[in-house]
């Protein structure tokens, strides 16, 4: 999908190295390692920034003897004149976009499903840095499509126009609940897909 949708993904600057054409455990392991590396880099930036801030407070304090400043406060700081810079200017915001993977190992059932486990613990990957997971699929609950335990952990659902009432009943049964009744969900969906130029 990454190769065939290059024109679409070009606006979000997806690097070639960030595309995985063979969905499976190996790709997921590499992705989690990348998240952990981003988290380690961010933690190192935070550590350096805290040291730099502390050093600056001491340097600005007229009551502090400069010779008494611990030298370890300067260790690892690349530039004493300006604060350390983070890679993005903020904490990394990482996302995994899974597209056209229906029928692959990602959506197998069973307790050994690595992708299912990642979807459930995505907020805790990278020591809490997290990884948002976006799943694009054409079938809500067909065999080989998005597993029920993944759907039950979803926080958002973008649902396009669907004319098959059985499918809509299934979606409504899973998506309604505390905040919506089945009827309210179906009415909201009918309203949403009938408005404007978008049918979702």
Predicted regions and their residues:
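Long amphipathic alpha-helices with heptad-repeat character
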Residues: 38-52
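Conserved AAA+ ATPase small/helical "lid" subdomain
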Residues: 179-200
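Conserved P-loop NTPase motor cores
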Residues: 1-9, 14, 22-32, 49-50, ...
